[in-house]
């Protein structure tokens, strides 16, 4: 009995010091309000933290800053023309030049840097497109020239085949012809050939005497002396 009363006194003291205790129920822990007598087990709800006034003001400032940056991104035509002119002179943007351009145009240096970065990217893409167009045009010309060469090769191959066929036909005809007939035909053609040096029998050839020189007369006398 004394031991049980001692345990009750300790529990009563603990409930006064710790008003909320946990009691196991169906293998789950439930927070019990000891001050209310523990008649009903009510789970404790967590309260959401309220934002302080300073934090809300900070968020509003962030939104305003973002809106200001968005407004700064809208450039006028004059600013765009000046930036294009500066980019045409020099594609790279150094820190001193960036500050100078930003001061002249009334822009933020970061905005100028971002504009130059985007402009360089567009410029590089354009250069790549131009280089690709040149290479594609060169490739198309090479392919066209190759097709023309292949067509010429086919024509020349056909002509060569026809020439070889004619050569074979001529060789076969020469092999079929006998040698005697060829020699007789050649002799007949030689006999029938006209002779330009044959003299007509009834023609008188009178050579003037005065055309004969002394050497010719001396030779004639020499030959006449031999036959006397």
Curated annotation (Swiss-Prot):
Induction: By abscisic acid (ABA), by salt stress, by indole-3-acetic acid (IAA) and during darkness conditions. Down-regulated by cytokinin. Residues 68-127 bind DNA. Residues 36-62 are annotated as: Disordered. Expressed in root meristem, late flowers and siliques. GO terms for biological process: response to auxin; root development. GO terms for molecular function: DNA binding; DNA-binding transcription factor activity; DNA-binding transcription factor activity, RNA polymerase II-specific. Keywords: DNA-binding, Homeobox, Nucleus, Stress response, Transcription, Transcription regulation. GO terms for cellular component: nucleus. It is found in: Nucleus. Probable transcription factor that may play a regulatory role in auxin/cytokinin signaling during root development. This is Homeobox-leucine zipper protein ATHB-53.
């Amino acid at each position: 009995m004394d031991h049980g009363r001692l345990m009750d006194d300790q529990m009563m003291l603990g409930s006064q010091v710790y008003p909320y205790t946990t009691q196991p129920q169906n293998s789950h822990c439930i927070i019990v309000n000891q001050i209310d007598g523990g008649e009903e087990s009510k789970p404790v709800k967590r309260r959401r933290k309220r934002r302080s006034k300073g934090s809300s003001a900070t968020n509003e400032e962030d939104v305003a800053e973002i809106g200001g940056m968005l407004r700064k991104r809208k450039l006028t035509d004059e600013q765009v023309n000046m930036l294009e002119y500066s980019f045409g002179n020099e594609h790279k943007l150094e820190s001193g030049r960036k500050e100078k351009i930003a001061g002249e145009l009334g822009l933020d240096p970061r905005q100028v840097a971002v504009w130059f970065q985007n402009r360089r990217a567009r410029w590089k893409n354009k250069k790549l497109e131009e280089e690709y167009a040149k290479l594609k045009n060169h490739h198309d010309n090479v392919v066209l020239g190759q097709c023309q060469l292949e067509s010429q090769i086919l024509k020349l191959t056909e002509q060569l085949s026809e020439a070889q066929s004619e050569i074979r036909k001529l060789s076969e005809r020469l092999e079929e012809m006998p040698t005697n007939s060829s020699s007789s035909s050649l002799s007949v053609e030689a006999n029938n050939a006209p002779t330009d040096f044959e003299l007509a029998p009834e023609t008188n050839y009178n050579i003037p005497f005065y055309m004969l020189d002394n050497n010719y007369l001396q030779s004639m006398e020499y030959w006449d002396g031999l036959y006397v």
